[in-house]
Amino acid sequence: MAGRSGDSDEELLKAVRIIKILYQSNPYPTPEGTRQARRNRRRRWRARQRQIHTLSERILSNFLGRPAEPVPLQLPPLERLNLDCSEDSGTSGTQQSQGTTEGVGNP
């Protein structure tokens, strides 16, 4: 892995193996039984998946030495932001707002 020492790579691979084992220990429930029983099994499975996800974040943050939350993005002041509603803007593949900029931000 780019820019990392071999020892750090081994620790990261160990963390990934631990996380893989955690996810493999919680297979999706079988589709047998009554509707209520299946629903309860899926509900418990989702709760375990949430716990595994939380544990995985903690394991990775511990091994990588940084928090799982992203660093806050620095945004420009609101006064400098504007909405461009022109149809000839060259951004293909994105939706353009059809509203007007009048009254935006005013109560």
From Swiss-Prot:
Gene Ontology, cellular component aspect: host cell cytoplasm; host cell nucleolus
Short name of any one Pfam family annotated for the protein: REV
Location of the protein in the cell: Host nucleus, Host nucleolus; Host cytoplasm
Span(s) of short sequence motif Nuclear localization signal and RNA-binding (RRE): 34-50
Chain positions covered by the region annotation Homomultimerization: 18-26
Segments for region (Disordered): 26-48, 81-107
PTM annotation: Asymmetrically arginine dimethylated at one site by host PRMT6. Methylation impairs the RNA-binding activity and export of viral RNA from the nucleus to the cytoplasm.
Compositionally biased tracts (Basic residues): 36-48
UniProt biased composition (Low complexity): 89-101
Entry keyword annotation includes Ribosomal protein: no
GO molecular function, one term: DNA-binding transcription factor activity
Keywords of this entry: AIDS, Host cytoplasm, Host nucleus, Host-virus interaction, Methylation, mRNA transport, Phosphoprotein, RNA-binding, Transport
UniProt short sequence motif Nuclear export signal and binding to XPO1, positions renumbered to this chain: 73-84
Lineage: superkingdom: Viruses
GO biological process, one term: viral process
Function in brief: Escorts unspliced or incompletely spliced viral pre-mRNAs (late transcripts) out of the nucleus of infected cells. These pre-mRNAs carry a recognition sequence called Rev responsive element (RRE) located in the env gene, that is not present in fully spliced viral mRNAs (early transcripts). This function is essential since most viral proteins are translated from unspliced or partially spliced pre-mRNAs which cannot exit the nucleus by the pathway used by fully processed cellular mRNAs. Rev itself is translated from a fully spliced mRNA that readily exits the nucleus.
Subunit structure, interactors included: Homomultimer; when bound to the RRE. Multimeric assembly is essential for activity and may involve XPO1. Binds to human KPNB1, XPO1, TNPO1, RANBP5 and IPO7. Interacts with the viral Integrase. Interacts with human KHDRBS1. Interacts with human NAP1; this interaction decreases Rev multimerization and stimulates its activity. Interacts with human DEAD-box helicases DDX3 and DDX24; these interactions may serve for viral RNA export to the cytoplasm and packaging, respectively.
Further comment: HIV-1 lineages are divided in three main groups, M (for Major), O (for Outlier), and N (for New, or Non-M, Non-O). The vast majority of strains found worldwide belong to the group M. Group O seems to be endemic to and largely confined to Cameroon and neighboring countries in West Central Africa, where these viruses represent a small minority of HIV-1 strains. The group N is represented by a limited number of isolates from Cameroonian persons. The group M is further subdivided in 9 clades or subtypes (A to D, F to H, J and K).
Protein family (similarity comment): Belongs to the HIV-1 REV protein family.
Record note on domains: The RNA-binding motif binds to the RRE, a 240 bp stem-and-loop structure present in incompletely spliced viral pre-mRNAs. This region also contains the NLS which mediates nuclear localization via KPNB1 binding and, when the N-terminal sequence is present, nucleolar targeting. These overlapping functions prevent Rev bound to RRE from undesirable return to the nucleus. When Rev binds the RRE, the NLS becomes masked while the NES remains accessible. The leucine-rich NES mediates binding to human XPO1.
Protein name per the record: Protein Rev
Gene (UniProt): rev
